[in-house]
């Protein structure tokens, strides 16, 4: 199986989520199940069934995070050579040539992608279109919503 790229910061966030699920959420759900059981007949006990469903969802999320972390290739961006080129983990400031606006993105793996917060996956059209480009390059990227034209203003490895 191929390794999934993730930044060092992304690994820390996923480990924190996993810890919370295992040591906060899981015990709370177990308590809720025990409390619901104490109410008697389980066939008609909505609290019990809701808690059991939540338990299943939580266990699935725990398994998903454990699998993701086991298959992650952690990349510390600060250790990469500073070439001025866009690489995995780099933070890029772009100037949109069409709208005259600047925007910043960080190129990350699928596990930590959060476009609303400027974290875009290396596997997206924008991510793929920027990799290997340098400061000053103008790039034209086809996206599902149309063509985007950018100039790369800054590339940081932070």
Q: What residue ranges belong to the model's regions?
A:
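Helix-rich terminal scaffold detector
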Residues: 1-63, 158
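Conserved NTP-handling cores and scaffolds of large molecular machines
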Residues: 22-25, 69-73, 134
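Non-DNA-binding regulatory cores of transcription-related proteins
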Residues: 75-151, 156
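Residue-level signal for pocket-adjacent positions within structured domains
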Residues: 1, 16, 37, 43, ...
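Amphipathic alpha-helical coiled-coil segments
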Residues: 59-73
């Amino acid at each position: 199986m191929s390794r999934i790229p993730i930044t060092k910061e992304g690994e820390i966030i996923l480990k924190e989520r996993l810890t919370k699920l295992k040591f906060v959420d899981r015990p709370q759900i177990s308590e809720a199940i025990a409390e619901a059981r104490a109410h008697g007949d389980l066939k008609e006990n909505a609290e019990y069934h809701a808690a059991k469903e939540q338990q299943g969802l939580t266990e699935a999320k725990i398994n998903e995070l454990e699998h993701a972390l086991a298959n992650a290739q952690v990349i510390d961006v600060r250790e990469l050579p500073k070439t001025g080129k866009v690489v995995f983990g780099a933070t890029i400031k772009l100037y949109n040539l069409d709208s005259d606006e600047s925007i910043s993105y960080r190129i990350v793996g699928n596990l930590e992608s959060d476009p609303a917060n400027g974290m875009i996956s290396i596997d997206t059209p924008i991510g793929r279109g920027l990799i290997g480009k340098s400061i000053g390059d103008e790039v034209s990227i086809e996206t599902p919503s149309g063509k985007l034209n950018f100039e790369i203003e800054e590339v940081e490895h932070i």
